[in-house]
Structure formats: structure tokens, C-alpha cells
Amino acid sequence: MLDIDKIPADQPVLIAGPTASGKSELALRIAEHSGGVIVNADASQVYDCWRVVTARPSAEDESRAAHALYGHLSYDTLYSAGHWLRDVTPLLKGTKRPIIVGGTGLYFLTLTEGMADIPATPPEVRAEADTLSLETLAADLDPETRARIDMQNRARVQRAWEVLRATGRPLAEWQDDTPPPLLPAKDCTALVVEAERDWLETRIRRRFSMMIAQGALEEARAMQDRYDPALPSCKAIGVPELMAHLSGALTLEQAEERASVATRQYAKRQRTWFRARMKSWQRVSPQA
């Protein structure tokens, strides 16, 4: 059981966890108890167009504590872990203790273990990668890189392929040359929310129905004329499914079910990743 009274008020807090696990609620409790600014570490929550679909903090939540890096980007902005690290850096030096929370493990990894200085991907290399299947991209990667990334996440696999294609060096080699981290985990209260699978899956099944009731369909309808499935912002779970419903390809019930399945699959990958890459972090229950 986590005793938030024992968390040093002047020490940064990191909270990682799978989707729908209650990590944002925990961050808000800590902020209200001992102060701080809640900083987003979830790649889908950086876009201004998706508050409901991506479960960004509500306006009420934002009124209870300071929040940063939520919904601060236009839907068509390309945003990487490197961009996030740049944006979070000044918050580490601010007057309020950062409480960094999210489900994008790569963000936490770059923060606590450092980030390789990899050259930007040339547009022609990215254009070539966009035409290739996930299987084709994966087949070109070296074993060490394959072992380090989520091989079911196209964005991660494509990024690794682009690095190899553009530089001639595997992503794993670049990572091995990484400079010191901005914020080592040992200097933080580093927490991973570990939710029991059945409990989490029940929450996930309820969650999308709640999103529909809260306006997720209206959110998707407002973006329908700008929807581009190639954009990272439009790949957030729930967005393709709702767009398919709006186009007549799926019933709303089918869209809800597909989104729930995709969310459960994503949560499973997140749990696996956190277990493998955050072994030294303190485990806490959602009810902590």
C-alpha cells in the first residue's frame, strides 16, 4: 500500500501504468495532498482535439491541480519522444515539483535513462517506410533492436527501421551511446501502477461506453473532415473505430467492441513492457 504522506514533497514523482489503471487519479491525489504540477507522459494525450477519446484530465480535474503538456498540440503535429523530452525539461527546473504520469513507456525511458542523439529522419526515408508493411519493416531489424521495442507497435518499429535506413546503424547501437539522463529514476519517487487483469479489463469494457456518453462521438464528428489515418493523432485507440462508425462501416456497438478489444491488447503490451523495463520502480495497486 502506498502511503502518500511518505513521498518527499520536494522530490519528482513518476507514475507509469497501463491504460485505465487509475494512474491519473493517483497523480491528482498526490498533487492535492502535497503540491506539484501534473505532467503528461502519454503520447495520445498531447493533441488538442481528443480530450474524451484519450481520457485526458477533465476541466474539473485541471481546476484541482496544475497540469502541463496536455492537449497542447494541433492534430497534424508530428511529435516524438525527443520532442516530449525537450518540452518536459523546463518543467523539471520550475518552482512546482513535477508529477509525471502516463502510459508511454518510451517517454519515461528517455527521461530516466537518457536519449540517443539520432539524426532526424529524411522525408524520403519516412515516405518509403510509410509504404511498407509492419512485417517488412520488422524483418529488416537486428535482433538486439527487436528485443528492445514493442514489435506490435508500428510507430516504434517504423522509427527503428528509419534510423537503420538513414544512418546505417541499428537503433540499439545508437541507444548504447546514449548520454546521461535528465532525471535518473533513483532521484525520484518512481511508481508503476499494477492492476489485476480481470479488474482492469472490467474497467476497460466500461470505459468506452462512458466515453460515448461523455461526448466521444461528437469529438470524432468534429474531426471527421480532417481525419487522416496516417497521422499519429488519428491512431489513438477509439478514433479509427468511431470514424468507421461515422462512415457507416460499423455500427456503434461494433465500434465500441473493437475499441475495447484494442484497448485490452494495448494494456497487455504496456504491462509486459513495464515489467521488463521498470524492474526497479515501486509497484503500487490502483487502490493505493
From Swiss-Prot:
It catalyses: adenosine(37) in tRNA + dimethylallyl diphosphate = N(6)-dimethylallyladenosine(37) in tRNA + diphosphate. ATP binds at G17, P18, T19, A20, S21, G22, K23, S24. It is an enzyme of class 2 (transferase). SUPFAM superfamilies: P-loop containing nucleoside triphosphate hydrolases. Its cofactor is Mg(2+). It comes from the Bacteria. Substrate binds at T19, A20, S21, G22, K23, S24. Monomer. Catalyzes the transfer of a dimethylallyl group onto the adenine at position 37 in tRNAs that read codons beginning with uridine, leading to the formation of N6-(dimethylallyl)adenosine (i(6)A). This is tRNA dimethylallyltransferase. The gene is miaA.
